[in-house]
């Protein structure tokens, strides 16, 4: 039997998340008295590095060093709603929830500080 050789190309669509009921994830960000921040999640790190990715997302969005971010994934009773850690959704869904929460937290903190200092928040 003759061996045939050639070249080919393949394309695949790999969905991220399940899109069940919108596939939501939420994140809560708490400022501490030491100036650090705690990110509360109901997703868990299953060895894929989710806690590190989430901390990096928050640090970048808040404009803080990574050392000032603590990620808490231990308590689904106090953590926000999340569909779960499955289907390659951790970084995409949870990471984006953290970025949105961190941006909102930064905006609120800047507004409060600007009002207290009687300056424009953009300054």
Segments predicted by a language model, with ranges:
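Short acidic, glycine/serine/threonine-rich loops at helix termini
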Residues: 50-52, 80-85
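Generic hydrophobic, helix-prone segments enriched in Leu/Val/Ile
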Residues: 2, 14, 86, 97-98
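Flexible, active-site-adjacent loop/turn segments at secondary-structure boundaries
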Residues: 7, 44, 83-84, 89
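Helix-loop-helix junctions that connect adjacent transmembrane helices in secondary transporters/permeases
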Residues: 1-36, 45
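Alpha-helical support elements that line or immediately flank enzyme active sites
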Residues: 18, 31-71, 89-119
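Short glycine-enriched loops at secondary-structure junctions
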Residues: 72-77
């Amino acid at each position: 039997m003759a061996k045939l050789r050639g070249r080919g190309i393949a394309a695949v669509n790999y969905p991220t998340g399940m899109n069940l009921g919108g596939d939501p994830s939420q994140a809560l960000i708490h400022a501490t008295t030491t100036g650090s921040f705690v990110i509360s999640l109901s997703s868990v790190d299953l060895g894929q590095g989710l806690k590190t990715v989430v901390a990096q997302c928050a640090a970048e969005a808040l404009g803080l060093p990574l050392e000032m971010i603590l990620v808490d994934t231990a308590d689904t009773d106090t953590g926000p709603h999340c569909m779960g850690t499955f289907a390659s959704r951790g970084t995409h869904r949870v990471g984006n929830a953290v970025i949105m929460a961190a941006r909102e937290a930064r905006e609120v903190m800047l507004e409060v500080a600007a009002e207290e200092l009687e300056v424009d928040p953009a300054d």
